[in-house]
Amino acid sequence: MTTQHSKTDVILIGGGIMSATLGTLLKELSPEKNIKVFEKLAQPGEESSNVWNNAGTGHSALCELNYTKEGKDGTVDCSKAIKINEQYQISKQFWAYLVKTGQLDNPDRFIQAVPHMSFVIGEDNVAFIKSRVATLKKSILFEKMKLSQDEEEMKSWVPLMIEGRKSDEPIALTYDETGTDVNFGALTAKLFDNLEQRGVGIQYKQNVLDIKKQKSGVWLVKVKDLETNETTTYESDFVFIGAGGASLPLLQKTGIKQSKHIGGFPVSGLFLRCTNQEVIDRHHAKVYGKAAVGAPPMSVPHLDTRFVDGKRSLLFGPFAGFSPKFLKTGSHMDLIKSVKPNNIVTMLSAGIKEMSLTKYLVSQLMLSNDERMDDLRVFFPNAKNEDWEVITAGQRVQVIKDTEDSKGNLQFGTEVITSDDGTLAALLGASPGASTAVDIMFDVLQRCYRDEFKGWEPKIKEMVPSFGYRLTDHEDLYHKINEEVTKYLQVK
């Protein structure tokens, strides 16, 4: 059964952190706008934003070695690390503003201070990390980072990683107390609760069937209620597709030229989760290692303290898996259905180029539990098999697209796609994703609300005082803002 059209100003597809962030920003900047949200599942934040479906790292390049590139001459390029840290500073400022204005309460339910650390083994890697720290510390954003090779100091930071270590190879650790663990699922739920109180219509168990633009310029979005089987067509001036792995198939339905020659490659993740509370309580850090030579960036191993509903947990991974699904709750036909006449060459080109990724995935799929435990023991030498269980994390769909230089290039970041007229936007890709949600949504607003954005800037600077500045170039502003963030988010 189909009901009549329903008109709205904004439609947000997907009940994750991206839609929650964009909806919250729009309600602050243009409260008169009528906003509707459609989510396929029964509650918000259950796919990529779910606490067990992502690493929960507040990505700020304090520990992630893949954000700093080493040159042949031994110098380290930290520009990407600084950019990602700046983006996360924007997220923290916005969350602090929402706490300050009473729109978010109990920040400890979604963010915790957890030190971020890097861990390397071997002379070459130790030399790299020393150069990395020396370069990063030139920026105020990394002023508190410490580097150590002293056994006692390292043991005071992460005893489980030092006890039982027998190798003669040199190791080094960095330590930054300003790191965080974020439960993006809990944050998403809080943001949507606040939006509902402000009159935003959030509908669950809703499957978006089609998105088509009319000659009048408005978008028609056909939505099926999964409980009643009724189909409703909604008219909207603006549509945002923030549906995680489902964003690509939905973008393809729009028919905009930006949806052509673009594909997606799904990668699933497995983690080892500790079941021994005594072990869990002895580790308090997010420790990132260095990806093996030839391995993709998403393979960086890390030993992670997590907080879920106030309880401490410990994870190690990721180990890559493969499923053709684009969502954890998706269909095994997702990958096949995403192949279109306009992107088949793009997809095949990527397949030929990315043989190393294919080889890596095959090797990961062949791992036994004992082999996974051996990988863990590189970090935690005394780890016992009986203290760990395997869990399946979320699906990530890596973007494949053509560039000016060549076809079929695999992208490892987060990508915003917008229509020429700015009436539709979609978010594709993976890490750093959720951590940079606020900055990414500012980009969406700038590209899609060009005429209104200038008038919004005073309010934006009230919410995010560093907007328009690079904090790395403004030490006094950084310290002033950091005091406010620390006060309201209760982090370091």
Curated annotation (Swiss-Prot):
**Which keywords fit this entry according to its UniProt record?**
FAD, Flavoprotein, Oxidoreductase, Tricarboxylic acid cycle
Spell out the InterPro entries in the cross-references. FAD/NAD-bd_sf, MQO
Reaction(s) this enzyme catalyzes, per UniProt: (S)-malate + a quinone = a quinol + oxaloacetate
The answer, when asked if Methyltransferase is one of the entry's keywords, is: no
Molecular-function GO term, any one: 2-hydroxyglutarate dehydrogenase activity
Entry cofactors: FAD
Pathway listed for it is: Carbohydrate metabolism; tricarboxylic acid cycle; oxaloacetate from (S)-malate (quinone route): step 1/1
Among Pfam families, the record links this protein to:
Mqo
Documented EC number(s) = 1.1.5.4
Q: Member of which family? A: Belongs to the MQO family.
Q: What is this protein called?
A: Probable malate:quinone oxidoreductase 1
According to the entry, what is the taxonomic lineage of the organism? Bacteria, Bacillati, Bacillota, Bacilli, Bacillales
Question: Which gene produces this protein?
Answer: mqo1
